[in-house]
Swiss-Prot record:
Residues that hold Mn(2+) 2 according to the record: 299, 301
Entry protein name: Carbamoyl phosphate synthase large chain
Names of the cofactor(s): Mg(2+); Mn(2+)
Pathway info: Amino-acid biosynthesis; L-arginine biosynthesis; carbamoyl phosphate from bicarbonate: step 1/1; Pyrimidine metabolism; UMP biosynthesis via de novo pathway; (S)-dihydroorotate from bicarbonate: step 1/3
Swiss-Prot/TrEMBL domain comment: The large subunit is composed of 2 ATP-grasp domains that are involved in binding the 2 ATP molecules needed for carbamoyl phosphate synthesis. The N-terminal ATP-grasp domain (referred to as the carboxyphosphate synthetic component) catalyzes the ATP-dependent phosphorylation of hydrogencarbonate to carboxyphosphate and the subsequent nucleophilic attack by ammonia to form a carbamate intermediate.
Length: 1073
């Protein structure tokens, strides 16, 4: 039956900021849903607080609200826009929870809005653990023995019944938040306390342990006529006990017999029928006991998920797009499959003739003190996917695409080490982020397949594959480059070995292996992802490489081509913002008539959607893989400045190989990154920088530090996201830094800068075309200098800086752009102290603020700059004036500390945020208040505030205290702060620090006495002492600031109402015109 005509407009709920467990896969699904529904003539209204998404671009929906995804705000949007229906299945757990809340609060009924895609009852039945268990029993499927608890007493009673170890999962949370595995009562109580706190319904499910069972997922799509298709089966390489988001996964499932697969297929369809999903996609997770084949249903998600993004990219079947059309009444047989050009209907189950491997990417090095063992709580921040003709090829391609310094199965331990075996065994038994490499080491150290299986419970079939690769590596090392004849080299390439790995094994340079392949004329061919295992011809150019006979790439020869290199897997410091830029480059150049080619390996993103570019190569972004694509495509230009450090690292090597890198030249990029070369440019332009030095040894650093003066910012050269960057306060601190952190330098020097305490930091994004410079936006940071710019909230326009100071910065940016010969985007960071402007750094590439600035000003910077790189001047594009909006936009960051108990949430020069939100208001205060609501802050309007500040903040704290009093807060202060306040006539209640006796600060936080805490520190001892305050504030959900500037912004926002007025991006941009 065709689409519904009783609904004319549809509200899509987005997923909000990127957090661990909910990443850019929902931008991909939301963007697809917007396109699909507008194609059908519906009016689409979108709400999503994350500005770094493609779906919040003004052309994606008819009305776009970058507002907090909070039921009261969404109610305002519904009241204003009057949609007929709401689609909550595209925005992850955030959207589902918001939709259920709108239903509970009677908002949907009040405005006559229907829920489409999933009914409130189906969502509740799938998410409510007790109802789900009952539903499964009804259709004869087993679930794990379990019980439900709402209090600690109930939880302990369930544990007595289920036994240890047991698995704890809170209801209605995402990415296993608050859950875990408890092996004893102490761990059990700790996990339950955290879980009860995080579950919006205060409900825990406590399961028998299925640790060591095999885990599978089925991606199912069902329509209202009960047509059901399995899009993809996915098998977890890691056994149960590790969250599926943290597991290596393989599609299609490799170790099921046909009979087992059919049983699981039928079971997953039965689950969708029973839960009542009849208009869209779901994923159903199963566990199988390898000893006896017992099958258990773990859970199902009645929405588009991380796995469905993976399944879409793995098969080419656009689940989100199809689900959106089913939600408005179509059936599967009425929809055509785009990839085959409509030669097959969407009711054909995809079949694939290749293997797909996904490996998660972790960032534990950013979180000192975090528990880096993998459990049922998700901890990975990104993922990489690779496609190959065999399991071995796809696994090795994924390993090199992960960008963790491995080009394949590089050894982790030296076999000469007497502790080697002990270490390998420990890593296999208790999995961390690197277990896959330790498995290869185990085979090198002489463990058998059974031996590894007993430690890991990973299916022997997978282990045999890895063992064979290790044996081949040993053979290469034995015969050397002279033994690599054409036949042997071909065999190795078919198994996915990278040139770089073979070079290391043979003891030669990578270029020599490449030369050898050229001699043998040994190059990959490209196959197409077509959903039908090559049964039907396909017009869609979605390719992967493999070493076989027939090439299906079929590149055009009549059009000018531009290739965009993507950013690879998400990680902290390089996330969705860079993908956003890549997508914009591709869209703009397509509009201008170029054929665009995208190279990337991140399955979550819009850039790897088959219709974002003319041609998509789903390949690792490494030198070898990129050069092979360039060899057959012969592009006119390659863009490396948009994908973060991943493609930038390749710029020089690509240029050396004769690849036309367009935009700012690799040499100019190097001039900005290399300290000494940059220093020459700065001196020539007579710009001010904080006193600094470059050192190569510890004693030299100690000498230079005396000249520059403490505190210092220390860091290795060439980093993104502030890796190994710290503020040190004295010589002892400096020596400690050199002993613990300088190993990251790879013979590169370490940079010392005088730290400008209390300076205001400013980010400026600009575009230069060689003739003029366009200022995109000037953003004033809210946290003072010293907090990494990626972790600081910022305001556009600036909210305290004078016009004169801003003009000085504009002039300096212009001088720098011409001096460095920038063609395209650049980002400059300044610090302002005592009305002096200091230059901090220049990045001649896309910065993570580009999407935010584009949304705030209505100027699509990434598109404009891409056209500049392709040779179209700013004047020709008609974009020559800086836009200063008549409203304020505030970007606030979202930090993942709740996933890492034990890590100090103090902000510093090392970036740790995973995502961002944006708030827009007529005043700075209103915009800041909205950004706080959007980032799930727990800011309250009144209550009791605790003030504990460092020496340098004591005079300014008086003003803040007065503002809080005026707002109706009662005040507490620690000893030193209380004295200063007392002298100013403010008398707070005195509280003890932790070492001063009880009741102390921590007791009072635990008792729920505070609604707001401000705690600023400097010096290592003070930071250690006050760490317990920050951890407790986080744990007990008290809004806290670790900078005084943050405190002042909070005080301003207390007067504003974040839920009072909503404004769409289209209305914002209309005010600028």
């Amino acid at each position: 039956m065709p689409k519904r005509t009783d609904i004319k407009s549809i509200l899509i709920l987005g997923a909000g900021p990127i957090v661990i467990g909910q990443a850019c896969e929902f931008d991909y699904s939301g963007a697809q849903a917007c396109k699909a529904l507008r194609e059908e003539g519906y009016r689409v209204i979108l709400v999503n607080s994350n500005p770094a998404t493609i779906m919040t671009d003004p052309e994606m929906a008819d009305a776009t609200y970058i507002e907090p995804i909070h039921w009261e705000v969404v109610r305002k949007i519904i009241e204003k826009e009057r949609p007929d229906a709401v689609l909550p299945t595209m925005g992850g757990q955030t959207a589902l929870n918001c939709a259920l809340e709108l239903e509970r609060q009677g908002v949907l009924e009040e405005f006559g809005v229907t829920m489409i895609g999933a009914t409130a009852d189906a969502i509740d039945k799938a998410e409510d653990r007790r109802r789900f268990d009952v539903a499964m029993k009804k259709i004869g499927l087993e679930t794990a023995r379990s019980g439900i608890a709402h209090t600690m007493e109930e939880a302990l009673a369930v544990a007595a019944d289920v036994g240890f170890p047991c698995i704890i999962r809170p209801s209605f949370t995402m990415g296993g938040s608050g859950g875990g595995i408890a092996y004893n009562r102490e761990e059990f109580e700790e996990i339950c306390a955290r879980g009860l706190d995080l579950s919006p319904t205060k409900e825990l499910l406590i399961d028998e342990s299925l640790i060591g069972w095999k885990e599978y997922e089925m991606e199912v799509v069902r329509d209202k006529n009960d047509n059901c298709i399995i899009v993809c089966s996915i098998e977890n390489f890691d056994a149960m006990g590790i969250h599926t988001g943290d597991s290596i996964t393989v599609a299609p499932a490799q170790t099921l017999t046909d009979k087992e697969y059919q049983i699981m297929r039928n079971a997953s369809m039965a689950v969708l029928r029973e839960i009542g999903v009849e208009t869209g996609g779901s994923n159903v997770q199963f566990a199988v006991n390898p000893k006896n084949g017992r099958l258990i249903v773990i859970e199902m998600n009645p929405r588009v998920s991380r796995s469905s993004a993976l399944a879409s990219k793995a098969t080419g079947f656009p689940i989100a797009k199809v689900a959106a059309k089913l939600a408005v009444g179509y059936t599967l047989d009425e929809l055509m499959n785009d990839i085959t050009g409509g030669r097959t209907p969407a009711s054909f189950e995809p079949s694939i003739d290749y293997v797909v491997t996904k490996i998660p990417r972790f960032n534990f090095e950013k979180f000192a003190g975090a528990n880096d063992r993998l459990t049922t709580q998700m901890k990975s921040v990104g993922e990489v996917m690779a496609i190959g003709r065999t399991q071995q090829e796809s696994l090795q391609k994924a390993l090199r695409g992960l960008e963790v310094g491995a080009t394949g199965f590089d050894p982790k331990v030296s076999l000469d080490d007497p502790e080697a075996l002990t270490k390998i065994r420990r890593e296999l038994k208790d999995a961390g982020a690197e277990r896959i490499w330790y498995i290869a080491d185990a085979f090198r150290a002489g463990l058998s397949v059974d031996g590894v299986f007993n430690l890991t419970n990973i299916d022997r079939w997978f282990l045999v594959q890895i063992e064979e690769l290790v044996r081949l590596e040993e053979k290469v090392a034995e015969v050397g480059i002279t033994g690599l004849n054409a036949e042997f080299l071909r065999q190795l390439k078919r198994k996915g070995f990278a040139d770089a790995r073979l070079a290391k094994l043979a003891g030669v340079r990578e270029a020599e292996i490449r030369k050898l392949r050229d001699q043998y004329d040994l190059h990959p061919v490209y196959k197409r992802v077509d959903t039908c295992a090559a049964e039907f011809a396909t017009d869609t150019a979605y390719m992967y490489s493999t070493y076989e006979e027939e090439c299906e790439a079929n590149p055009s020869t009549d059009r000018e081509k531009i290739m965009v290199l993507g950013g690879g897997p998400n990680r902290i410091g390089q996330g969705i913002e860079f993908d956003y830029c890549c997508v914009h480059a591709s869209l703009a150049l397509r509009e201008d008539g170029y054929e665009t080619i995208m190279v990337n390996c991140n399955p979550e993103t819009v850039s790897t959607d088959y219709d974002t570019s003319d041609r998509l190569y789903f390949e690792p972004v490494t030198l070898e893989d990129v050069l092979e694509i360039v060899r057959i495509e012969k592009p006119k230009g390659v863009i490396v400045q948009y994908g973060g450090q991943t493609p930038l690292k390749l710029a020089r090597a690509l240029e050396a190989a004769g690849v036309p890198v367009i935009g700012t030249s690799p040499d100019a990029i190097d001039r900005a990154e290399d300290r000494e070369r940059f220093q020459h440019a700065v001196d020539r332009l007579k710009l001010k920088q904080p006193a600094n030095a470059t050192v190569t040894a510890i004693e030299m650093a100690v000498e230079k530090a005396k000249e520059i003066g403490y505190p210092l910012v220390v860091r290795p050269s060439y980093v993104l996201g502030g890796r190994a960057m710290e503020i040190v306060y004295d010589e002892a601190d400096l020596r400690r830094y050199f002993q613990t952190a300088v190993s990251v330098s790879n013979d590169a020097p370490v940079l010392l800068d005088h730290f400008l305490d209390d300076a205001v930091e400013v980010d400026v994004d600009a575009i230069c075309d060689g003739e003029m410079v366009l200022i995109g936006g000037i953003m004033e940071h809210i946290e003072q200098a010293g907090v990494h710019s990626g972790d600081s909230a910022c305001s556009l326009p600036a909210y305290t800086l004078s016009q004169e100071i801003q003009d000085v910065m504009r002039q300096q940016v212009q001088k720098l752009a011409f001096e460095l010969q920038v063609r395209g985007l650049m980002n400059v960071q300044f610090a302002v102290k005592n009305n002096e402007v200091y230059l901090i750094e220049v990045n001649p590439r896309a910065a993570r603020t580009v999407p935010f600035v584009s949304k705030a000003t209505g100027v699509p910077l990434a598109k404009v700059a891409a056209r500049v790189m392709a040779g179209k001047s700013l004047a020709e594009q008609g974009v020559t004036k800086e836009v200063i909006p008549p409203y304020y936009s505030v970007k606030e960051v979202v930090l993942p500390f709740n996933k890492f108990p034990g890590v100090d949430p103090l902000l510093g020069p090392e970036m740790r945020s995973t995502g961002e939100v944006m708030g827009v208001g007529r005043t700075f205060a209103e915009a800041f208040a909205k950004a706080q609501l959007g980032s799930n802050s727990t800011m309250k309007k009144h209550g009791r505030a605790l003030l504990s500040v460092r020496e340098g903040d004591k005079e300014r704290v008086v003003d803040l205290a007065a503002k809080l009093l005026k707002q109706g807060f009662e005040l507490d202060a620690t000893h030193g702060t209380a004295i200063v306040l007392g002298e100013a006539g403010i008398n707070p209640r005195l509280v003890n620090k932790v070492h001063e006796g009880r009741p102390h600060i921590q007791d009072r936080i635990k008792n729920g006495e505070y609604t707001y805490i401000i705690n600023t520190t400097s010096g290592r001892r003070a930071i250690e002492d006050s760490r317990v305050i920050r951890r407790s504030a986080l744990q007990y959900k008290v809004h806290y600031d670790t900078t005084l500037n943050g405190g002042f912004a909070t005080a301003m926002a207390l007067n504003a109402d974040a839920t009072e007025k909503v404004i769409s991006v289209q209305e914002m941009h209309a005010q600028i015109k």
